[in-house]
Design a protein with these regions (language model features):
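Pyridoxal 5′-phosphate
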Residues: 1-400
Length: 400
């Protein structure tokens, strides 16, 4: 049976080049980077080189890059580190105010909810339009004297919509000019760039970003490594106590092989971005054309402001999880916006925020392409999917 992996927005396989770069740091180059001897110096050099690669890619300084275990930790660190610092350093702000959107990754939404629950912050959750895009005007109107953080994802992981990050960055920069004149705390801008960093411009100065999170396992590096960019001057308190690693902002012995992997992943992104993006866009276009020939299927997300690798559909008369199981039987791995939680099938919070009814959201199907996706694989999916949908639609009346 053919095996076709179209769930690259969930995770990617580790590339051979990255695995080869990591391997020496599991065996011969095993030193602790905090030690002054040869092995420690060797490990420290590897970390410094990886940090510099990532900093150069983002247009940042090496000391502004903090290594974490994943994007979720990076997001938690960004929000909690900033809020705790402001809460205890700016006495005039009793409840720091965060602005985010209803379509963020759960790492952002649950972190904000936690900070609300413990009484540290007030949060505004902005609506989105039918494409999943936040209105710049809504951000402007939501900003108040206590606002300290705007956190909007760069590219949505479920539907691929690209948010107007550059425009948001310029808006915040403009607002901060007047806030400084009024002796108010600046508003800082965080973005979750996990789905964007492989394909889109992530220059932090050009976009006006103060904090940026991403993960390695979406870049063909292993699970267990991520990073947080923190602009110099952003108030910040570490959330993990211990040694002074990561510029005293994230304690713990550095995971050298995985840091090397992340540096190598970014190096490969920089080398291959243009070619890879063009190839994936062509394959995605063919996939969309083929899938939309099926009756009762519609494409979700913005028609043009869209990540090159994600294509999400809503299929009338077919449930997402059931489609995944039947596709898996055919050797195809995909994803759905619905997730099984506590025995109850809950519709995607992203799709419902975009205005889709729960029943529609349950019929979502996401294909996410990668560098190894081929034309033959797309042709096979386009051939098999109509059969799967037809089978489920025939079964549907019997299940009611």
């Amino acid at each position: 049976m053919k095996k076709i992996y179209l769930d690259n927005a969930a995770t990617t396989p580790v590339s051979p080049e990255i695995l080869a770069a990591m391997e020496p740091y599991f065996t011969n180059k095993f030193g602790n980077a905090s030690e002054p001897h040869f092995w420690g110096q060797e490990a420290r050099k590897a970390i410094d080189e990886a940090r510099e690669k990532i900093a150069n890619f983002l247009g940042a300084k090496p000391k502004e890059i903090i290594f974490t275990s994943c994007a979720t930790e990076s997001i938690n660190l960004a929000h909690k580190g900033l809020i705790e610092s402001i809460k205890y350093q700016v006495s005039s702000i009793k409840y720091p105010h965060i602005i985010t959107s209803r379509v963020e990754h759960k790492a952002v939404l649950e972190t904000c909810k936690h900070l609300e629950k413990i009484g540290w912050v007030k949060v505004t959750y902005l609506p989105v339009d039918k494409y999943g895009i936040v209105d710049i005007k809504d951000i402007r109107q939501a900003i108040r004297p206590e606002t300290v953080l705007v956190s909007i994802m760069y590219t949505n992981n479920e539907v691929g919509t690209i948010e107007p990050i550059g425009k948001i960055g310029r808006l915040i920069k403009e607002i901060n000019v007047s806030r400084v004149a009024c002796h108010l705390s600046p508003v800082y801008f965080h973005t979750d760039a996990t789905q964007a960093i492989q394909y889109l411009d992530c220059n932090v100065d050009g976009l006006g970003i103060d904090l940026l999170s991403f993960s390695g396992h979406k870049l063909y590096a292993p699970k267990g490594i991520g990073a947080l960019y923190i602009r110099s001057g952003v108030p910040f308190v570490r959330q993990q106590d211990g040694g002074g690693q990561e510029y005293n902002l994230r304690a713990g012995t550095e995971n050298v092989p995985y840091i090397v992997a992340l540096g190598k992943a970014i190096e490969l992104v920089e080398q291959n971005k243009v070619h890879s993006t063009k190839c994936i866009e062509k394959l995605k276009s063919k996939l969309i054309d083929g899938v939309l020939k099926i009756s009762g299927v519609k494409l979700v997300g913005h028609p043009t402001n869209q990540a090159p690798h994600i294509a999400t559909f809503i299929v009338e008369g077919a449930e997402g999880e059931a489609m995944l199981l039947l596709l898996s039987d055919k050797g195809i791995a995909a994803s759905s916006g619905s997730a099984c939680t506590s025995g109850l099938l809950k519709p995607s919070h992203v799709l419902t925020a975009m205005g889709y009814k729960p029943q529609e959201a349950h019929g979502s199907l996401r294909f996410s392409l990668g560098k190894d996706t081929t034309l033959k694989e797309i042709d096979y999916v386009v051939k098999v999917l109509p059969e799967v949908i037809k089978k489920l639609r025939k079964m549907a009346p019997k299940l009611i």
